From Swiss-Prot:
HAMAP family: Ribosomal_uS2_A. The keyword Transcription does not apply. Belongs to the universal ribosomal protein uS2 family. Keywords: Ribonucleoprotein, Ribosomal protein. It comes from Cenarchaeum symbiosum (strain A). Pfam families: Ribosomal_S2. Coiled coil: none annotated. The gene is rps2. InterPro entries: Ribosomal_uS2, Ribosomal_uS2_arc, Ribosomal_uS2_CS, Ribosomal_uS2_euk/arc, Ribosomal_uS2_flav_dom_sf. GO terms for biological process: translation. This is Small ribosomal subunit protein uS2. The keyword Nucleotidyltransferase does not apply. One of its GO terms (molecular function) is structural constituent of ribosome. One of its GO terms (cellular component) is small ribosomal subunit.
Length: 208
């Protein structure tokens, strides 16, 4: 999907819709009820577009306030490997795109022990170990959550489809762009270094 960013609300809605960001699941948790706007004939929930856009902006502001160098973005999903690497490259944070080793945030004796001030995860269930350790260490957590996720340990929820490769690419592209716009490094009416296609994992085997 090759796109040129515009601040126009209609354009943004089209981008979110075509990328599948707003596609939920057929399960709704009490935590995600507030972010659901509709249900399609198959019983699949639709996530609220305005809420998604608003939370992406809030997350970007949180990241910039904390400092991207203090952020770790991680995911145990194969489909998220390219999106989080591109995101980390653009905003200047650290990424963990393979297995999250227990103790990474809580055991100073580990060689790869880290002390971030903020954590970003793609799925609070898949990335439960990272979320648990961050919570125990007092580290705030930003999480992308679908309609069936439990979000009780997330400080900032980005309601979005966290399953689809295209959706993950779009989410991280939008979030990276928003961070760069806040910094003044990108003009919101012009293309940036990468397009959404560049953020998508084409083949989950490519990182193996």
């Amino acid at each position: 999907m090759s796109v040129r960013f515009q601040s126009d609300d209609e354009y943004m809605r089209n981008l979110i819709t075509t990328s599948g960001i707003s596609i939920g699941t057929q399960v709704k948790t009490k935590f995600m009820k507030q972010f659901i706007s509709d249900t399609d004939p198959t019983g699949t929930y639709t996530l609220d577009l305005e809420a998604t856009q608003g939370r992406i902006k809030a997350a970007a502001q949180f990241i910039e306030h904390t400092g991207a160098s203090e952020l770790i973005v991680c995911s145990g999903k194969d489909s998220a490997r390219v999106p989080i690497r591109k995101f980390a490259e653009l905003v200047g944070c650290k990424d963990i795109h393979k297995r999250f080793m227990p103790g990474t945030l809580t055991n100073p004796d580990l060689p790869k022990y880290m002390e971030p001030k903020l954590l970003l995860v793609c799925d609070p269930q898949v990335d439960a170990q990272a979320v648990t350790e961050a919570t125990n260490a007092g580290i705030p957590v930003i999480g992308i959550a679908n309609s069936d996720n439990v979000t009780s340990r997330l400080d900032v929820i980005i309601p979005a489809n966290n399953r689809g490769r295209g959706a993950l690419a779009a989410i991280f592209w939008l979030l990276a762009r928003e961070v760069l716009v806040i910094r003044g490094e990108v003009d919101e009416t012009k293309p940036m270094k990468y397009e959404i296609d560049d953020f998508e994992t084409k083949d989950v085997r490519e990182d193996e």
